[in-house]
Structures are given as C-alpha cells and as structure tokens.
C-alpha cells in the first residue's frame, strides 16, 4: 500500500491542485449566478420563468468558460445530449467531419453508421466523414489539416475520451491544436466537442482553447455523482440557442421546460462535481499504479494525463 501511494505521488499532488482550482471556480460560478435557496424549487406545466433552471445554466456556463449553457434533467444520456446538439446545428447536405476517428458505439446509430434507424443524421441527408487515427491511437494532425482544408465541413467533430477503444484521451493541448488547425484551414467550420468524462480533470477548459460548442452528461463527471440524470450543452450563445430550439420548439427554446423538483439535486451535483471528478481520477491513478506493481500492463498509465 505504501509503495503504491508513493509511486504516483507527484501525479496525485497535481490532481489535488486541479481539484482545488476548479472547486474555487465553481464556488465563484455560484456567486456570479446569484444562486439562492429559492432556486432549488421546481416548476410544473410549461416551466416559464423557472429562475432555478436559468441560474443553473449560468453556473455551468461560467464553470466551462462558455457564453451560454443548456442544462436539463430530461437529457436521457450523453448520447441523447450530443444528438440534440448535432441536429440543432447541422442541416441537410452539411458535412460532419470526425477528426478523432470512428465515434464510439452509441452515437453511431444516431449518425446513421450502424443499423437502419429512422431519424438518424443520414436519414436527413447529413453527411459523415472521418479522419482515421494513427496506428498508436493518436491524432493524425497532417491528415486532419488536409481534409479540413479540402472539404470545408460545416462541423469539425472531436471526441475527447477514448470511449470503448484503447486509445489516449485528449488533453486540452491536443484539443487546442485541433482548434488552431481547423480555424486556420476553414474558419467558418463549427468545432464541436464530445466532452463526456472530460469535465473538471484539467484547469483549462475546451471553450478557452477554441471549441465552439460541447456537450456531456450529468450522469458522469459534470453531475458530481448526485444529479439523478441529465446532460448539458455549452458554448457560443447562438449555437446553444439552436440546440435549445431542437430540444423544445423553435421560438420557445430555453424559455420552457419544467424542472419538476430536480433543481436542488442538479445544483448539488454541480457544486460537488470538481471534487468528485478528481477523487475518481485519483482512484484511477492509484489503481493503475497498483496493478503496474503487480506486473500488469495498464492503460492509461498512472503517469499519463
């Protein structure tokens, strides 16, 4: 046990620093959003003037360095949240270019890559293209730049986590490099990030390095293990508004959607998310170090970001 703790001690100290930074930032987000007890009450019916719902959007927008956010309990999963964002932004004949290879399993059917489900992106005439990863699972930046320059896609799509494959997850540095390449090769392309499992594990946010819109799940990091369900979309205000029109109806957007008494748990989840996410990260680092000592090959290594 002592040996296992000593091995990754520098990494654990680094995570503690990230944890403290993001927790203080979340506290500031609550202050900036003016969160108070009355925001914990729910609404019914149409949900007009649900001040708690609106304050929660402001909290996540601040925490993620975004212009706006759409945080709702009725996002059923991360895949559902991503699908709403994709349909909110893309139109028939648009092209979505994945620069991190094949997306993970659950989003493929929504795109139209697997199965023949009605209502997929493919069903609506939206095109999907991708740039394969290198043999070692890292991003092929040269190929990405060439494809973006040639195709000028409506959307450049980045998947941050490894999903269900064995490849490195992306840090903000890789995301920043992809954003720089995209904005230089095709300034009008919208950069979208699947940020599932990527919240609060670094000090630098994807929005601050060039991402235009991102989405994730409250069932994972962003809900702090307290949010019972839900998801979020955050980014540029006009893009978030487009996604809100897809979630509800054009014209009403973020103005409707009863919270049904879920606000309190969602606020609690947001508050604890920076702490809980880093505790989970420390557990993963410890487990990786332990099994490496026992002679196992581990991925990711305890020393990886």
Question: Where do the protein language model's features map onto the residues?
Answer:
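N-terminal glycine-rich, Lys/His-bearing helix-loop that initiates the first secondary-structure elements
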Residues: 1-33
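Active-site loops and adjacent core secondary-structure elements that bind or stabilize anionic groups
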Residues: 5, 300-305
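Conserved PLP-enzyme active-site core in the AAT-like
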Residues: 6, 26-32, 36-39, 47-48, ...
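Active-site-flanking structural segment that lines cofactor/substrate pockets
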Residues: 40-70
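Generic structural motif recognizing short loop/turn segments at the entrances and edges of beta-strands
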Residues: 67, 124-127, 305
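Early transmembrane hairpin of solute transport permeases
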Residues: 72-74
